[in-house]
């Protein structure tokens, strides 16, 4: 056991985590040169296309160190994006140490800080690494100072390397072996294994990634899931070298995969503890804190025949993604679908794209909303995650919206722009600290504003230099209203949105104008209105298509023309009473982009 090292790699987006892991795999001979490709661990097509890591991946490698010993390295590559920070905390729970990778050109950014603090809270040994020293813009001395100044860990002898060229990666491994402590645990004790991650394989059933904390797991053992009390047979187990390799046992301190032929996707929840049925452990390991979704949106299949397939797909995805929440929902405009909870907009996009690609579904998304806390006049507190669930205005005593605490790191030059943006988003400044020419800003901004387009706008006002990390702080009373969209006097539930009263006029007007462009013209006038309760705040009309009934009257008598026009008018009126308006898919998407184009 003293030769096992469990660690994960944490860093801000694009600081070179995945490239560094490629190099480590290459040096330790995990893959032959022929099988080597860039970002080996980003196995999803989606990850490769966007160049981001979404799922944490684990690898077991053997490394012969300069002291002559051979060490077993179990390492986990983690995502850098704020929406996937729960993946990071899960991975860290399985490790004793973490490599903090910092780009020697960019320096410390918000996620670097957030992930590093997560690691420190879990008492992990953090080893700083300065990456990309081959870049002309690299300034390792300044960045080392920044790490000490902002993060507060000693970086005087931080390892310098360039994952792209491979310079210094050997030193990173040596430092790892030296500084990160071996796992603790009792190899002879009753088995306790933490489930770090699970995913569904069509042939094998549920595959779980586990970290053995105490005891040993052998092939053929009967294992028990502690939260459900169910027992299964350990059919196959092994490690990833990135390839799946079968083993006969997993020892104390190791990280590996396990297949128990579990067909039910909720059979092995992430964060649960496995133990042996014949000699169970007394208590479960502390799992992970459940992450609460921050953004909710309705997902509906375009054709109602896909509903069953959609339900199965969501089940399989939620196994792989512990933070995805979903419950059935029906809408008069869109039929049956699900109300899903996500961690942020990127997460929502990724899930939708994975559903469309991996499960071949066509989906419509409604506008994302956050969770509001509503106190009714009968003093009952309810949580509302969709505009249609909001009680009538006269039943609401107080409506509270979630406030996010946003930590931003940015160069001083962009401070003015960013403050203007935060104020526009109804933010309140709580802290501001200068570190050299960087500024650390802390603002409290309503979650609804953050999830809408705050991240994109922050990046564009600061030319991409500002970085953001946010977390939920509290609920706060606020003057929020529900804006309904009426089409020919009928409410369309899928288009309602909750917004602040100050913005409601603008949002309503914009939405109505957008809808006007998107709804095709019909044989009769279509009135599109935005309303708060019964009060109409904006209206526009899609003009009817009409035939020129006077074309055949040459010169002619005025009364003849009047008669024809009158006849046409009556026909249109009759049509309007029975006519239905077909809303195109783009109309539902328009609501996602309200307030984006006019900046």
UniProtKB/Swiss-Prot annotation:
Domain (tr-type G) ranges: 2-184
Residue numbers binding GTP: 14-19, 131-134
SUPFAM superfamilies attached to this UniProt entry: EF-G C-terminal domain-like, P-loop containing nucleoside triphosphate hydrolases
UniProt cross-references to CDD domains, sorted A to Z: EF4_II, EF4_III, LepA, lepA_C
Catalytic reaction equation(s): GTP + H2O = GDP + phosphate + H(+)
GO cellular component: cytosol; plasma membrane
GO molecular function: GTP binding; GTPase activity; guanosine tetraphosphate binding; identical protein binding; ribosomal large subunit binding; ribosomal small subunit binding; ribosome binding; translation elongation factor activity
Gene Ontology biological process terms, A to Z: positive regulation of translation; response to cold; response to pH; response to salt stress; ribosomal small subunit biogenesis
Primary residence: membrane
Domain of life the protein comes from: Bacteria
Keyword Transmembrane: no
Pfam families noted in UniProt: EFG_C, GTP_EFTU, GTP_EFTU_D2, LepA_C
Top enzyme class: hydrolase
Coiled coil: none
This protein's record includes keyword Hydrolase: yes
E.C. code: 3.6.5.n1
InterPro entries recorded: EF-4 (IPR006297), EFG_III/V (IPR035647), EFG_V-like (IPR000640), EFTu-like_2 (IPR004161), G_TR_CS (IPR031157), LepA_C_sf (IPR038363), LepA_CTD (IPR013842), LepA_IV (IPR035654)
Keywords linked to the UniProt accession: Cell inner membrane, Cell membrane, GTP-binding, Hydrolase, Membrane, Nucleotide-binding, Protein biosynthesis
Function of the protein: Required for accurate and efficient protein synthesis under certain stress conditions. May act as a fidelity factor of the translation reaction, by catalyzing a one-codon backward translocation of tRNAs on improperly translocated ribosomes. Back-translocation proceeds from a post-translocation (POST) complex to a pre-translocation (PRE) complex, thus giving elongation factor G a second chance to translocate the tRNAs correctly. Binds to ribosomes in a GTP-dependent manner.
Family statement: Belongs to the TRAFAC class translation factor GTPase superfamily. Classic translation factor GTPase family. LepA subfamily.
Database matches in NCBIfam families: lepA, small_GTP
Name under which the protein is recorded: Elongation factor 4
């Amino acid at each position: 056991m003293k030769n096992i090292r469990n660690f994960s790699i944490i860093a801000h987006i694009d600081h070179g985590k995945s490239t560094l892991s490629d190099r480590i795999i290459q040096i330790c001979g995990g893959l032959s040169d022929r099988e080597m490709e860039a970002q080996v661990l980003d196995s999803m097509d989606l990850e490769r296309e966007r160049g981001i890591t979404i799922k944490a991946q684990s690898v077991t490698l053997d490394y012969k160190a300069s002291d002559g010993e051979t060490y077993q390295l179990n390492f986990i590559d983690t995502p850098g994006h704020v929406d996937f920070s729960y993946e990071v905390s899960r991975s860290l729970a399985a490790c004793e140490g973490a490599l903090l990778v910092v780009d020697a050109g960019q320096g410390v950014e918000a996620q670097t800080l957030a992930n590093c603090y997560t690691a420190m809270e879990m008492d992990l040994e953090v080893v700083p690494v300065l990456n990309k020293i081959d870049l002309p813009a690299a300034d390792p001395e300044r960045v080392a100072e920044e790490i000490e100044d902002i993060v507060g860990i000693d970086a005087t002898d931080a390892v310098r390397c360039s994952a792209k060229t491979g310079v210094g990666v050997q030193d990173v491994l040596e430092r790892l072996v030296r500084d990160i402590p071996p796992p603790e645990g009792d190899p002879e004790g009753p088995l306790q294994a933490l489930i770090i991650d699970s995913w569904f394989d069509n042939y094998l059933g549920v595959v779980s990634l586990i970290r053995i904390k105490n005891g040993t797991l052998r092939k053929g053992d009967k294992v028990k899931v502690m939260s459900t009390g169910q027992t299964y047979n350990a059919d196959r187990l092994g490690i990833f070298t990135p390839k799946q390799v079968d083993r006969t046992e997993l020892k104390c301190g190791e990280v590996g995969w396990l297949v128990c032929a579990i067909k039910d996707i909720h059979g092995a929840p992430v964060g649960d503890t496995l133990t042996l049925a014949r000699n169970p452990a007394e208590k479960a390991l502390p799992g992970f804190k459940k992450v609460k979704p921050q953004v909710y949106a309705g997902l509906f299949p375009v054709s109602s025949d896909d509903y069953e397939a959609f339900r199965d797909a969501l089940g399989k995805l939620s196994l792989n993604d512990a933070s995805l929440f979903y419950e059935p929902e029906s809408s008069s405009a869109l039929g049956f679908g699900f109300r899903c909870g996500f961690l942020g907009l990127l997460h929502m996009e990724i899930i939708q794209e994975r559903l469309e690609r991996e499960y071949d579904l066509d989906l419509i998304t409604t506008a994302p909303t956050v969770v509001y806390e509503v106190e009714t006049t009968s003093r009952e507190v309810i949580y509302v995650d969709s505009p249609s669930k909001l009680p009538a205005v006269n039943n609401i005593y107080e409506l509270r919206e979630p406030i996010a605490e946003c930590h931003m790191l940015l160069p001083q030059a962009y401070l003015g722009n960013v403050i203007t943006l935060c104020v526009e988003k109804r933010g309140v400044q709580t802290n501001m600290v200068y570190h050299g020419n960087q500024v650390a800003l802390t603002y409290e901004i309503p979650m609804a504003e953050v999830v809408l387009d705050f991240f994109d706008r922050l990046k564009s006002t600061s030319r991409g230099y500002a970085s953001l990390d946010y977390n939920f702080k509290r609920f706060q009373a606020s003057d929020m209203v529900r804006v309904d969209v009426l089409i020919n006097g009928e409410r369309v539930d899928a288009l309602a949105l909750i917004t602040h009263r100050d913005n409601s006029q603008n949002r309503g007007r914009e939405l109505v104008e957008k809808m006007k462009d998107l709804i095709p013209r019909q044989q009769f006038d279509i009135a599109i209105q935005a309303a708060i309760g019964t009060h109409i705040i904006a209206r526009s009309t899609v003009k009817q298509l009409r035939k020129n009934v006077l074309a055949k009257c040459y010169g002619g008598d005025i009364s003849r023309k009047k008669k024809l026009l009158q006849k046409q008018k009556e026909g249109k009126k009759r049509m309007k009473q029975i006519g239905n308006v077909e809303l195109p898919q783009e109309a539902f998407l328009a609501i996602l982009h309200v307030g984006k184009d006019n900046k």
